[in-house]
Amino acid sequence: MAVTVAQKAQIVQDYQRAAADTGSPEVQVALLTARINDLTGHFKANIKDHHSRRGLLKMVSRRRKLLDYLKRTNLESYKTLIERLGLRK
């Protein structure tokens, strides 16, 4: 099941820096993490869905790039985000 509008709004509200902030790296990483977690469950049932797996790999790569940017620019925010989302590194 895809991430619903209500779930997306809740994620944005939880991770935004200021009111109406939807583009900060923290929000983008949190949204990508929700989509990645959702697709991971999809692949347990649909092992041969290679077309969607390519999209998953692109999302993981985009999340990694955003995390690298955040680590370079704001290390404290990076550390708290990694801990809140339960990601490695």
Swiss-Prot record:
GO BP of this protein: translation
Keywords for the protein's UniProt record, in alphabetical order: Ribonucleoprotein, Ribosomal protein, RNA-binding, rRNA-binding
InterPro entries tied to this protein: Ribosomal_uS15, Ribosomal_uS15_bac-type, uS15_NS1_RNA-bd_sf
Molecular-function GO terms, alphabetical: rRNA binding; structural constituent of ribosome
Database matches in SUPFAM superfamilies: S15/NS1 RNA-binding domain (SSF47060)
Pfam family, any one: Ribosomal_S15
Keyword RNA-binding attributed: yes
UniProt-listed PROSITE patterns: RIBOSOMAL_S15
Residue runs in coiled coils: none
GO cellular component assignments: cytosolic small ribosomal subunit
SMART domains given in the database record: Ribosomal_S15
Record note on quaternary structure: Part of the 30S ribosomal subunit. Forms a bridge to the 50S subunit in the 70S ribosome, contacting the 23S rRNA.
Family the UniProt entry places it in: Belongs to the universal ribosomal protein uS15 family.
Role according to the record: One of the primary rRNA binding proteins, it binds directly to 16S rRNA where it helps nucleate assembly of the platform of the 30S subunit by binding and bridging several RNA helices of the 16S rRNA.
Protein name, UniProt field: Small ribosomal subunit protein uS15
